[in-house]
């Protein structure tokens, strides 16, 4: 009888300790992605795929080709080596606006406006056209741009609603 109690206590002790070891105290997975590019600079991960919040823009501000406030965005370049290539141009592409092929079209429930992209001097950048060359420095560099929503003109009806637009960028080093 005494032996049975000892055996029962031993089985319970080992059973409880194995349950404690089996408890999930956290787990996960780390996936590393990227690409190797033939360029004098690396593109910072936060610049490769970003979202620019345009905000809630009054339809009145867009009447007759009116513009929203510009929203700045950057393309950050890292570890640049300018020993051979010293400048970079940026080309933005995307679905062009039906009202103005130089601007980026919007999709969604909103309509009657388009996205304009500008360089750091507030000069409009036409879709599919390279910017003026920007001089690079060794190390890290920041390419500054801005975007604003622009009404499609006097004859356009600006319809309130949500919108999105996607622009791809390509860098070319000289």
UniProtKB/Swiss-Prot annotation:
One GO cellular component assignment for this chain's record is: pilus
InterPro entries (alphabetical): Adhesion_dom_fimbrial, Adhesion_dom_fimbrial_sf, Adhesion_dom_sf, Bact_Fimbrial_Adh_Pro
The question of whether Repeat is a record keyword is answered with: no
Q: Does the keyword DNA damage apply?
A: no
Source lineage: Bacteria, Pseudomonadati, Pseudomonadota, Gammaproteobacteria, Enterobacterales
What the protein does comes down to:
Major structural component of mannose-resistant fimbriae of Serratia marcescens.
Instruction: Give the organism the record lists.
Output: Serratia marcescens
Record-stated family: Belongs to the fimbrial protein family.
Where does it live in the cell?
Fimbrium
What name does the UniProt record give this protein? Fimbria A protein
Disulfide bridge positions per record = 41-80
Signal peptide, first to last residue: 1-22
User: Keyword annotations for this protein?
Assistant: Disulfide bond, Fimbrium, Signal
